[in-house]
């Protein structure tokens, strides 16, 4: 007998030999003639002498596999398989791997990094466990249709905007200024400004009749009647002129541009009064409940703009006495720009403490509405869901929810404008878009939606559906007797009584995001529900069809189908109309599988095995079981799968995570799984994706509407207040006040009161005074110049210094005139020793002179003489005569200037007296001691 050949392989991912091709090795045994050496076999060889021995071994261990589940660890298989590559194989491998083969090999390794394979042992089913296929199911039929209604809708919201109208403000601007007049300046010490209302009689008889206004203002302050006159002059009617600046929507007229002020004589207070008649056309605003209105001037009138004396308007709110209010029917106001009269109208006038306001009266119900249109929607779908109506508006990406009962608009105060306006809009849309394709079904319907929105809805029906309904109605009328009438509950939904509440108001949210989110949710819900319904129905139908396929394929391969259905590895067999199944346990970790490299039957040249032969070796020494490799790593505990040997035999079998290739019933090589092309039996599920829906930025209330919610427009008020001075007064005009002019005017008025003679004297006095004032003005102007002031300051400083030195000189003349007149002569007197008498006689001529006393270092020559009493008396006489000479010269000089005889005569006599002066003796010119 020829030896039996075995092929074995160790699985070890850490060794490089694992991925390489196997080489053939054969070893011969005396038992089996076709034995082959297993490459890398590391255990004791197991030799089976004959086929009978295989069956005996199988019967010995079969009971163990049937009663207990033997599991094989994935690692045990690879531990029992090992390939020792030869040198030629390494050379071949290196020849096939180029620069890019390393990357390919790394990719293959990453693809082969899978879980370790599991081998199953499937015993033949004995019929102890039988199953059957479930009969076909009845697939559900989902009806997603709802009661949809097409239509046109107009959505209304709460009107938060103020009611605006034109009003005219009449007042007189009274300014009383008190000024103090200084010598060269004018100072305002007090200023009083007030607004005075213009009487209605002056408005009707002067302003709107002649376009003029009086310069007199009469008003009440502190419970006293006060009068003011422009420029403190007699009153007169002054023409109204347009203001220089006007704001948007506002015009104004006034009588003067100047503010009158009087500057009196220096040191006096004067008061001046100016009265400016001002008429302003302003914007007035009133908000719900319209019990007051505000003006763009900042004033608030606590009276309804709809207050009047007719049509029940006297019931409107008012906080003023009736004598302050006047209403004129057919009143014609004058346009102060064109001087033309306007159309007759009902004119209201109200006199307040500071102004008079006038406006045209109009009925309340025709002017204001508590609701305002928000959106016009041409295509709306209404459906009933959970006892509510849903209005889906795709153009706005919103869904509004309301009750199924209609809403009575009469419950809302001042909502009379809604139906008329909505009807006109719906008629326009229907005429332009749906006139040829749809018909109207009933009248317009109103619903109160969540969030405070009122939906005015017009149901529509396509022409095709209308024809079907008409045919159905004709058929019903033919089949029923004419005595029968429709029951009253056909319109019970609309006939539900609604409790009316008078003066009801609604509050609309400032955001519509909730409606947009509702629309998005409904859109997603509709799409998902429809998709799931279709999938469920299709899935059920597919299962019924697959059931028929399962039933037909079970006789062909019951084990594969049963394993797929039961989601576990089983062995199955058809037993009539039922299926017998048995469980396929996994091999344990103490088992090793050996794959043989030959598929030929020993001793036969025509019979071969159709599946590879394997040997299951237990590592715990319990024995070896021979079998065949089944499909999907199934281990068959028999070798009954035979076939006639054929030429050019080529087979691929899955063994673990790889395919083994047999050619002519002999093992050739191992092939990786990823090297075998794959075809898929799966069908992709093509579902419709959810459509994109973008949220549109919708504003319930615009910025202008939000700005108009208040009673006053503060921006307009600030604009008006800042322009007030520019509009009615000339801020660029400067009036120069001169105190000298004031003095001259006062003196002129005084002399004019004295008559003709006084005027003549006044001209002379005013001329002299004018010259004096001009001189003073020139001097003050020079001083006002910075350089002039600096020069004057320097001169004053120099004068002060000169005065200081002059004062010292005069003081010196008074205290010691000789020292002041003869400082050098008297210098030696300062050098006399203390206690020495300057008038004492010198003892001898050799004594130290006076000039040398106390100064021994003086190198100048000294006068060697002492005090001489005679010389002292002579000096006194000389001083007297010098005084007389000076006086005579002054007298003679004055006489020459005046050319008068008396003065000359006096001068001559004085000279003669001096010449004939007794006691005069000639002064000696030589020194007494002699030099």
UniProtKB/Swiss-Prot annotation:
Residues 72-786 are virion surface. The record marks 494-495 as: Cleavage. One of its GO terms (biological process) is virion attachment to host cell. Keywords: Disulfide bond, Glycoprotein, Host cell membrane, Host endosome, Host Golgi apparatus, Host membrane, Host-virus interaction, Membrane, Signal, Transmembrane, Transmembrane helix, Viral attachment to host cell, Viral envelope protein, Virion, Virus entry into host cell. Belongs to the herpesviridae glycoprotein B family. HAMAP family: HSV_GB. Homotrimer; disulfide-linked. Binds to heparan sulfate proteoglycans. Interacts with gH/gL heterodimer. This is Envelope glycoprotein B. It comes from Varicella-zoster virus (strain Oka vaccine) (HHV-3).
């Amino acid at each position: 007998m020829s030896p039996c050949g075995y092929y074995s392989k160790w699985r070890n991912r850490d060794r490089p030999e694992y991925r390489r091709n196997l080489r053939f090795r054969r070893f011969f045994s005396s038992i089996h003639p076709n034995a082959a050496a297993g490459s890398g076999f590391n255990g004791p060889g197991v030799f089976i002498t004959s086929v009978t021995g295989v069956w005996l071994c199988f019967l010995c261990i079969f009971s163990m596999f049937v009663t207990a589940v033997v599991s094989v660890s994935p690692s045990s298989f690879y531990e029992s398989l090992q390939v020792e590559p030869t040198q030629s194989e390494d050379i071949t491998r290196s020849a096939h791997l180029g620069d890019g083969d390393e990357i390919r090999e790394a990719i293959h390794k990453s693809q082969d990094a899978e879980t370790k394979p599991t081998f199953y042992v499937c015993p033949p089913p004995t019929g102890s466990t039988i199953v059957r296929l479930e009969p076909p199911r009845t697939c559900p039929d989902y009806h997603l249709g709802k009661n949809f209604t097409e239509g046109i809708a107009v959505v209304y919201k709460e009107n938060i905007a103020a009611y605006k109208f034109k009003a005219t403000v009449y007042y007189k601007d009274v300014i009383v200024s008190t000024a103090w007049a200084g010598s060269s300046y004018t100072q305002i010490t007090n200023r009083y400004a007030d607004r005075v209302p213009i009487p209605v009689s002056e408005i009707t008889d002067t302003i709107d009749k002649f376009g003029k206004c009086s310069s007199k203002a009469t008003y009440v302050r502190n419970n006293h009647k006060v009068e003011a006159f422009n420029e403190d002059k007699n009153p007169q009617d002054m023409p109204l002129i347009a203001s220089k600046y006007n704001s948007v929507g506002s015009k104004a007229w006034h009588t003067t541009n100047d503010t009158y002020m009087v500057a009196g004589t220096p040191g006096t207070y004067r008061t001046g009064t100016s009265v400016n008649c001002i008429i302003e056309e302003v914007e007035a605003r009133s908000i719900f409940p319209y019990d007051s209105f505000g003006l763009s001037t900042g004033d608030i009138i606590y009276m309804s703009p709809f207050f009047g004396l007719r049509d029940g308007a006297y019931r409107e709110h008012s906080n003023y006495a009736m004598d302050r209010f006047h209403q004129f029917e057919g009143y014609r106001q004058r346009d102060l720009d064109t001087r033309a009269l306007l159309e007759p109208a009902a004119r209201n006038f109200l006199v307040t403490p500071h102004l008079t306001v006038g406006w045209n009266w109009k009925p309340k119900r025709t002017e204001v509405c508590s609701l305002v249109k928000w959106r016009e929607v041409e295509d709306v779908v209404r459906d009933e869901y959970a006892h509510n109506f849903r209005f889906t508006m795709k153009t706005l990406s919103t869904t509004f929810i309301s009750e199924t009962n209609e809403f009575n608009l009469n419950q809302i105060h001042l909502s009379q404008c809604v139906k008329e306006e909505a009807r006109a809009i719906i008629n326009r849309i229907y005429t332009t878009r749906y006139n040829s394709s749809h018909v109207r079904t009933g009248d317009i319907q109103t619903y109160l939606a969540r969030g405070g929105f009122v939906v005015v809805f017009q149901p529509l029906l396509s022409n095709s559906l209308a024809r079907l309904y008409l045919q159905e109605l004709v058929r019903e009328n033919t089949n029923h007797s004419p005595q029968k009438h429709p029951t009253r509950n056909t319109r019970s939904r609309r006939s539900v009584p609604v409790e009316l509440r008078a003066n009801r108001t609604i509050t609309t949210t400032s955001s519509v995001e909730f409606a947009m989110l509702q629309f998005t949710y409904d859109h997603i819900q509709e799409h998902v529900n429809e998709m799931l319904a279709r999938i469920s129905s299709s899935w059920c139908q597919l299962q019924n069809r697959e059931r028929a396929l399962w039933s037909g394929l079970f006789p062909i391969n019951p084990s594969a189908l049963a394993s797929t259905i039961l989601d576990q590895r089983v062995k199955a067999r058809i037993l009539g109309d039922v299926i017998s199944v048995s469980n396929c346990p996994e091999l344990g970790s103490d088992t090793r599988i050996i794959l043989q490299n030959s598929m030929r039957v020993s001793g036969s040249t025509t019979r071969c095995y159709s599946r590879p032969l394997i040997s299951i070796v237990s590592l715990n020494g319990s024995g070896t079981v021979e079998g065949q490799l089944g499909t999907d790593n199934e281990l068959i505990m028999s070798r009954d799968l035979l076939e006639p040997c054929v030429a050019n035999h080529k087979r691929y079998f899955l063994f673990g995570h790889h395919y083994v290739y047999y050619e002519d019933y002999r093992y050739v090589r191992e092939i990786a799984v990823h090297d075998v092309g794959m075809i898929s039996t799966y069908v992709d599920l093509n579902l419709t994706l959810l459509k994109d829906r973008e949220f549109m930025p919708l504003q319930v209330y615009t910025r202008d509407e939000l700005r108009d919610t208040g009673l006053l427009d503060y921006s307009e008020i600030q604009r008006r207040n800042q322009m007030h001075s520019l509009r009615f007064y000339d801020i660029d005009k400067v009036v120069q006040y001169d105190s000298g002019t004031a003095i001259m005017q006062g003196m002129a008025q005084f002399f004019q009161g004295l008559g003709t003679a006084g005027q003549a004297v006044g001209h002379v006095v005013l001329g002299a005074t004018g010259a004096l004032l001009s001189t003073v003005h020139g001097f003050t102007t020079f001083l006002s110049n910075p350089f002039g002031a600096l020069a004057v300051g320097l001169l004053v400083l120099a004068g002060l210094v000169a005065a200081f030195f002059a004062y010292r000189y005069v003081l010196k003349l008074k205290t010691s005139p000789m020292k002041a007149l003869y400082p050098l002569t008297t210098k030696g007197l300062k050098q006399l020793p203390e206690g020495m008498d300057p008038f004492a006689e010198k003892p001898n001529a050799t004594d130290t002179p006076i000039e040398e006393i106390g100064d021994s270092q003086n190198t100048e020559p000294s006068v060697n003489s002492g005090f001489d009493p005679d010389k002292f008396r002579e000096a006194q006489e000389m001083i007297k005569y010098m005084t007389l000479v000076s006086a005579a010269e002054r007298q003679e000089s004055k006489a020459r200037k005046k050319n008068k005889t008396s003065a000359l005569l006096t001068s001559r006599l004085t000279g003669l007296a001096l010449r004939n002066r007794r006691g005069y003796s000639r002064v000696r010119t030589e020194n007494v001691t002699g030099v």
